[in-house]
Amino acid sequence: MKITKAEVEHVALLARLELTEQEAETFTGQMDAILAYVDKLNELDTDGIVPTAHAVPMENAFRADEVTPSIGIENALGNAPKRAESFFRVPKVIE
């Protein structure tokens, strides 16, 4: 697949990138080389190959949920500069 300078400039416009003429020329060559390499993959015989999402089996790496006591309101608010009952009091940020 051959990519043109106009296509590179169009993608740059969509990405809101300003490219110099030199950058557009450079990226056109680089993108063309990348797409040519990827196009080689189309030559591979993949019949009988099962599609996979991961190269290795994935397992859930999360720990089990455990109920533990919290630090409590007094400890949490102990060093708060201002508080209102059981809440942190912060300056108003919306006018």
Swiss-Prot record:
Organism: Geotalea uraniireducens (strain Rf4) (Geobacter uraniireducens)
Keywords: ATP-binding, Ligase, Nucleotide-binding, Protein biosynthesis
GO terms (BP aspect): glutaminyl-tRNAGln biosynthesis via transamidation; regulation of translational fidelity; translation
Family: Belongs to the GatC family.
Protein name stated in the entry: Aspartyl/glutamyl-tRNA(Asn/Gln) amidotransferase subunit C
EC number: 6.3.5.-
Record-level Gene Ontology MF annotations: asparaginyl-tRNA synthase (glutamine-hydrolyzing) activity; ATP binding; glutaminyl-tRNA synthase (glutamine-hydrolyzing) activity
Domain of life, per lineage: Bacteria
Functional description taken from the UniProt entry: Allows the formation of correctly charged Asn-tRNA(Asn) or Gln-tRNA(Gln) through the transamidation of misacylated Asp-tRNA(Asn) or Glu-tRNA(Gln) in organisms which lack either or both of asparaginyl-tRNA or glutaminyl-tRNA synthetases. The reaction takes place in the presence of glutamine and ATP through an activated phospho-Asp-tRNA(Asn) or phospho-Glu-tRNA(Gln).
